[in-house]
Amino acid sequence: MTKNTALTIFMVVLVIEMVMEETQGDTCHEYLYPEKCENNQCNSECATKFKEVGVFGFCVPPRSEPTEQFCICSYNC
């Protein structure tokens, strides 16, 4: 019984470590839709929302309507 418990705990720890390695170092993106997108405003909104170092945001026009823009926040996962 002790072997099974020890093996189960080892496997759970191994799986958790593998999941953490997969997400470390990746860049995630989230979209914000302000009424009027400006790069400085977008960048500050992203920094406020995620409260991390290395977060940045920029405005991008969507494919369908080039007059409206949205903000892309990029941050470390």
Swiss-Prot record:
Provide GO CC annotations from the record: extracellular region
Q: Which Pfam families match?
A: SLR1-BP
Disulfide connectivity for this sequence is: C28-C77, C37-C59, C42-C71, C46-C73
Reading the lineage from the top rank, the first entry is: Eukaryota
Q: Which InterPro entries does the UniProt entry name for this protein?
A: DEFL
- UniProt key word Nucleotidyltransferase: no
Looking at the UniProt entry, the stretches that span the membrane are: none
User: Any keyword Signal?
Assistant: yes
Q: Enumerate the UniProt keywords alphabetically.
A: Antimicrobial, Disulfide bond, Fungicide, Plant defense, Secreted, Signal
Where in the cell? Answer: Secreted
Signal sequence span is 1-25
Q: Which GO terms are recorded in the biological process aspect for this UniProt protein? A: defense response to fungus; killing of cells of another organism
Which family does the record claim for this protein? Belongs to the DEFL family.
- Specify the protein name: Putative defensin-like protein 129
Tell me what gene encodes this.
LCR13
